[in-house]
Amino acid sequence: MIRVGVLDLQGSVVEHMKILEKIDNVEPVRVKYKEDLDNIQGIILPGGESTTLGKLLKDFHIHDTLKEKIENGLPVWGTCAGMILLAKDIQGQEESYFKVIDIEVKRNAYGSQLNSFSIEEMLEDIDKEPIELVFIRAPYITTVGPNVTILKRVRKNIVAAKEKNVLVTSFHPELTEDTRFHRYFIDKFIKNK
């Protein structure tokens, strides 16, 4: 059984848990305290509000332990605000959080809640059929380092990338019924670790 953690401080936790429950041989685990990081094979940092999540990571004393585990190879996937937390740089903001993927992100790049949208797109690394991508006040990646692989662009903007054990997406696969992106994280990042 593969134990996949979902950071349970704020955001789309339940939605990620429900998708993970649909996948055979996967046990979703809520992660709220640093002790919850023991015995998981990967972790998802969900969408939410990045500033709030960053503060809660410190308040719950989980930031430093989680950062160390990611730096030591724990597979991690950040969706939307989770991507912001993992980025090396955040445009217009001096401080960043985990700094574990060599990207710069622009927060709320697609505008307000009213500018949220959904689109079906191909992601060749994942499947030959289109996947629904849901963007809600989404960030996008403005620059990538030399070791970062761009997985997807939408409207010329980078919305998915990976580097070593880190996967990031601007969009919310957990807000669809589709398990393919979660399976991709498990198959390519956790099983191939």
Curated annotation (Swiss-Prot):
It catalyses: aldehydo-D-ribose 5-phosphate + D-glyceraldehyde 3-phosphate + L-glutamine = pyridoxal 5'-phosphate + L-glutamate + phosphate + 3 H2O + H(+); L-glutamine + H2O = L-glutamate + NH4(+). L-glutamine binds at G48, E49, S50, R107, I136, R137. Belongs to the glutaminase PdxT/SNO family. Keywords: Glutamine amidotransferase, Hydrolase, Lyase, Pyridoxal phosphate. In the presence of PdxS, forms a dodecamer of heterodimers. Only shows activity in the heterodimer. Its EC number is 4.3.3.6, 3.5.1.2. The active site is at C80 (nucleophile), H172 (charge relay system), E174 (charge relay system). It comes from the Bacteria. Pfam families: SNO. GO terms for cellular component: cytosol; glutaminase complex. Catalyzes the hydrolysis of glutamine to glutamate and ammonia as part of the biosynthesis of pyridoxal 5'-phosphate. The resulting ammonia molecule is channeled to the active site of PdxS. GO terms for biological process: glutamine catabolic process; pyridoxal phosphate biosynthetic process; pyridoxine metabolic process. Pathway: Cofactor biosynthesis; pyridoxal 5'-phosphate biosynthesis. InterPro entries: Class_I_gatase-like, PdxT/SNO, PdxT/SNO_CS. This is Pyridoxal 5'-phosphate synthase subunit PdxT. HAMAP family: PdxT. GO terms for molecular function: glutaminase activity; pyridoxal 5'-phosphate synthase (glutamine hydrolysing) activity.
